[in-house]
Swiss-Prot record:
Family: Belongs to the bacilliredoxin family.
Protein known as: Bacilliredoxin SH1401
GO BP: cell redox homeostasis
InterPro entries associated with the record: BrxB/BrxA
Coiled coil residues, start to end: none
Domain of life the protein comes from: Bacteria
Length: 145
């Protein structure tokens, strides 16, 4: 049996993109798109997506379920580490004081990083832990919807 690795990975990436987009996150694929969103006033939750197991098993489900809450960011966006490299690097430029990490979440307010949930706060935790961390950020920085 001959398995085409690129074809397989394209399917994995497409599924990961669709999963987060179906949860209501806008995919940013260029540096210009990142700047256009993150320079706006208000709050933006950035999910740095990836194909690793903790992204699919923990981060993306948490990103979706955390939205069933009274307080929410103004915008939900995602960049894909290892896929949309320009957009991911541009987003990471906003994450001042934090090392590159994927999967991860960053809450940006008025163009500045407030806090970040890094991979080490996701990997090895259960989905509910990450939901609670996200909703804690929403409580602290976001308005009721």
């Amino acid at each position: 049996m001959d398995l085409n690795f690129d074809l397989y990975m394209n399917g994995v990436v497409e599924q990961a993109r669709n999963e987060i987009e179906n949860a209501g996150y806008e995919q940013l694929t260029t540096a210009d798109e990142v700047d256009k969103v993150l320079q706006q006033n208000g709050t933006s939750l950035v999910m740095v997506n990836s194909v690793c197991g903790c992204a699919g098993g923990i981060a993306r489900p948490a990103a979706s379920h955390a939205l069933h809450y009274d307080k929410l960011p103004d915008r939900l966006v995602t960049v894909f580490a290892g896929q949309d490299k320009e957009a991911t690097q541009q987003a990471r430029d906003y994450f001042e004081g934090y090392a590159p990490s994927s999967p991860s979440f960053a809450l940006i307010k008025d163009g500045k990083i407030t806090e970040m949930i890094e991979r080490h706060q996701i990997e090895g935790h259960d989905v509910m832990d990450v939901i609670n961390q996200l909703q804690g950020l929403f409580d602290k920085y976001c308005d009721e919807r």
